[in-house]
């Protein structure tokens, strides 16, 4: 990456990643406090609602939707040749650990904080709405800013990935 002049971009991407992890951790922590102090009434009422179709179908669709939210796996493969021996498997492991912790945690909190009928009203800004419920307007704003940064990081990652792809195709 340094030879391509993208060293600064990798620092920006690392900063965006750190901010994102801290924001998600804060959402989970404050959401857990909210549920602890306000009870599980919303969660239990959400679990009582009937599912459309079967439970396996609901789990499949939920898993598929969660996979759409995972970014970075496809881009990290572009850097295999530039990484030291054994780094790429560690990178994948670390990404899977983060996804395994954050995705189920946030999904559980969504069920515990937001009544299902209310989800449709906030489908474009559900995490920000969860932040507003759990921590107030300041957390909602922080989550919105974080979302903007993450989208910017995705564009940056795509640029780096395309650059690697073009380099391999021209060799």
PLM region spans:
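Membrane-water interface regions at transmembrane-helix termini and the short interhelical loops
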Residues: 1-19, 78-82
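Residue-level signal for alpha-helical transmembrane segments in multi-pass membrane proteins
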Residues: 1-4, 23-34, 105-109, 150-153
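Transmembrane alpha-helical segments of multi-pass membrane transport proteins and ion-pumping complexes
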Residues: 3, 66-74, 99, 103-108, ...
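Juxtamembrane loop-transmembrane helix junctions in multi-pass integral membrane proteins
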Residues: 4-11, 52-55, 87-90, 131-141
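Helix-loop-helix junctions that connect adjacent transmembrane segments
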Residues: 14-72, 78, 101, 111-125, ...
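Hydrophobic, membrane-embedded alpha-helices of multi-pass small-molecule transporters
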Residues: 49-94, 142-155
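TM-loop-TM module centered on a large, flexible mid-protein loop between adjacent transmembrane helices
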Residues: 91-153
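Juxtamembrane helix-loop transition segments at the membrane interface in multi-pass membrane proteins
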Residues: 163-171
């Amino acid at each position: 990456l340094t030879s391509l002049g993208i060293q600064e971009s990798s620092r920006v991407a690392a900063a965006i990643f750190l901010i994102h992890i801290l924001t998600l951790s804060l959402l989970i922590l404050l959401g857990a406090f909210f549920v602890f102090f306000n009870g599980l009434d919303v969660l239990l009422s959400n679990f009582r609602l009937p599912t459309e179709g079967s439970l396996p179908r609901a789990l499949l669709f939920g898993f598929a939707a969660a996979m759409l939210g995972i970014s970075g796996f496809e881009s990290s493969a572009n850097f295999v040749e530039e990484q030291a021996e054994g780094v790429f498997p560690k990178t994948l492991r670390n990404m899977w650990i983060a996804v395994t912790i954050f995705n189920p945690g946030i999904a559980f909190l969504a069920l515990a904080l937001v009544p299902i009928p209310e989800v449709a009203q906030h489908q474009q800004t559900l995490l920000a709405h969860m932040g507003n419920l759990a921590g107030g307007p300041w957390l909602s704003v922080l989550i919105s800013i974080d979302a903007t940064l993450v989208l910017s990081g995705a564009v940056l990652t795509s640029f780096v990935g395309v650059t690697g792809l073009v380099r391999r195709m021209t060799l």
